[in-house]
Amino acid sequence: AIIRAVPEIIIAIIILTVTGLTPFTGALALAIGGIGTHAKWTYEAIETAPTGPAEAVKASGGTLAEMVRWGTWPIVQPELASLALYRFEINVRTSAVLGLIGVGGIGDMLTGYTQYRQWDVVGVLLIVVIVITMSIDAISGAIRRRIVAAKFA
């Protein structure tokens, strides 16, 4: 629970003391923050899934693995896929911010061009970040809608 409460930028600053200013620092911060959040979402999806299909598999002599495979997984898979796409969106947005503290990526480029007051390049980079983020948001939103629609079809 604690790891989910700590923003990725704070995680990156803590990791920075060990790994230095490298892209690995940013990737590790995103991974640590994402794993905690995604584990919670996975737990909640499985916990709130209807138990009827899994109980039916068990009643017909299925093993625990078969209960999960045929009873629980088909129910939670669309939600987990949707949540993974959402987390990917969050990671893309956060990676630009992490780059501002010097751990690589487009945020690192923004910092460099800002220091040299090359505002035209900064403007283009900001537009690129916004367009990429909006595109990922639109694409993953469409995929999530399809997944959810298929779940209820």
Task: List each model region and its residues.
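Membrane-cytosol interface at the C-terminal ends of specific transmembrane alpha-helices
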Residues: 21-72, 78-87, 138-141
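Short helix-capping/hinge motifs at transmembrane helix termini and TM-loop junctions
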Residues: 19-21, 101-104
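Short, membrane-exposed interhelical loops at transmembrane-helix boundaries
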Residues: 104-114
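Generic hydrophobic transmembrane alpha-helix motif, especially the helices
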Residues: 1-31
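Small-residue faces within membrane-embedded alpha-helices
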Residues: 5, 30-34, 75, 79, ...
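Transmembrane alpha-helix boundary and packing residues in multipass membrane permease domains
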Residues: 13-17, 26, 83, 95-99, ...
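C-terminal transmembrane helix and the adjacent membrane-cytosol boundary/short C-terminal tail
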Residues: 82, 123-153
